[in-house]
Design a protein with these regions (language model features):
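Autoinhibitory propeptides
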Residues: 1-31, 38-54, 313-316, 321-326, ...
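Generic recognition of flexible, low-complexity loop/linker segments
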Residues: 19-22, 99-100, 120-123, 202-203, ...
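Subtilisin-like serine protease catalytic core
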Residues: 21-160, 177-178, 250, 261-262
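Glycine-rich, phosphate-binding/catalytic loops in enzymes
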Residues: 48-54, 200, 232-234
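Substrate-binding/access-modulating region of protease and related hydrolase catalytic domains
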Residues: 141-232, 249-263, 269-272, 286, ...
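Non-catalytic, beta-strand-enriched accessory regions in extracellular/secretory proteins
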Residues: 233-246, 314
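Surface-exposed loop/edge segments in extracytoplasmic proteins
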Residues: 274-280
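A surface/secretory-pathway sequence property marking extracellular, secreted
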Residues: 281-289
């Protein structure tokens, strides 16, 4: 999972709501749980008018473990500790001696400001009186970044850490007996979009509880040409996908999701015209193919991953893809319409420059 866009609250007209005196809807008595890159707790945006922090807790997954009631890794700082750090900062001392968490990228702080900044100058958040609980996610492990060909300098997180962050926020709000709104400023270019992933199931289960709401972004990849859809025809006919690689890199990942109970298979044509004939759709099979002229390699896996939907997914890893036009021909092996969707890695995570034509 990678970071999503940071856009203005003017698009939802939120400032008009907070300015209505008869509504008095400013987030008071509600916890906003933020799952992101952390938060700059020194910012006055997150303090009340008395100068005390509105941040009730920060769970920094990247720090050394300190025993607590909620989780078994990372460190949790409570509101009293944050106020102590603020007082030290105002007195010219080092606040990080007391609360050692930072937001290096600023993404989490920005989103927290959009949601819950108090009025400073001409700016105000959507819920300026809400309490804040923030989870700073740790970066994805190296073997996962290597497997998905994630760019070295990209900010990328693991699904398991996000799920545990959501569970922590729910447990914390439950202990405090306060309503909870979870905001996750993250997204992934992969997956079926059916709501059957492990993270989707966790978030769905949380929203079944009273006074719990989950907010996520959508549409950030709309114009980046990372999606393709079409109808695969019955063999020997096929639907052709074209992927243009403008800049060679470590690689990228492609997923092709079948619709309904259809079974799909693929063939591959490299930029120099080297052909890998239609690969038999043996569920659970994993095969690799080398392209000598391009010095490239493609791994092809046929999988069924969602027990509820029962959809087939063809998982393809392009390693050192040569620049030029790669063609993927998609075949249907049934008499069903053969509709499918294909997605490649998020643009901001991709080590090379590739997109659908």
């Amino acid at each position: 999972y990678g970071l999503m866009d940071t856009s203005s609250i003017d698009a939802v007209n939120a400032t008009n709501i907070t300015s209505q005196p008869f509504l008095n809807s400013k987030g008071q008595g509600v916890i906003v749980g933020i799952i992101d890159t952390g938060i700059d707790y020194l910012s006055e945006n997150f303090c009340d008018t008395a100068g005390n922090t509105r941040i009730m807790a920060i769970w920094d997954q990247t720090l050394e473990y300190r025993q607590n009631l909620y989780v078994n890794y990372g460190r949790i700082y409570e509101q009293a500790e944050i106020n102590t750090a603020l007082e030290a900062y105002r007195n010219g001392l080092n606040p990080y001696d007391y609360v050692g968490t930072t937001d290096i990228t600023g993404h989490g702080t920005f989103m927290a400001g959009v949601i819950a900044s108090r009025k400073i100058d001409d700016y105000i958040g959507v819920a300026p009186e809400a309490s804040i609980v923030c989870v700073k996610l740790k970066n994805a492990k190296k073997y996962l970044r290597d497997y998905f060909y994630i760019r070295d300098d990209a900010v990328c997180f693991e699904e398991t850490d996000i799920m545990l962050a959501a569970r922590f926020l729910k447990d914390y709000a439950g202990l405090k007996k306060m309503p909870l709104v979870i905001y996750m400023g993250l997204g992934s270019g992969l997956g079926s979009r059916t709501g059957g992933s492990p993270l989707s199931n966790v978030l769905d289960s949380l929203t079944m509880h009273v006074n719990t709401c989950v907010v996520v972004p959508a549409g950030n990849e709309a114009v980046k040409r990372t999606h393709f859809s079409g109808y695969a025809s019955v063999v020997p006919e096929y639907k052709e996908m074209e992927i243009n690689v403008e800049r060679r890199g470590k690689g990228f990942v492609l997923e092709i999701w079948a619709k309904s109970l259809d079974v799909l298979s693929v063939s591959i044509i490299s930029p120099t015209g080297e052909i890998i004939p239609r690969i038999p759709a043996r569920i659970g099979s994993s095969t690799q193919y080398s392209f000598l002229l391009e010095n490239s390699r493609i791994y092809v896996d046929y999988q069924i991953t969602e027990t509820v939907a029962g959809q087939e997914v063809i998982f393809m890893r392009f390693e050192r893809p040569a620049e030029g036009l790669w063609k993927i021909d998609v075949y249907s092996l049934t008499n069903l319409p053969g509709y499918f969707n294909a997605w490649i890695t998020l643009k901001e995570l991709m080590d090379c420059d590739a997109y659908f034509l």
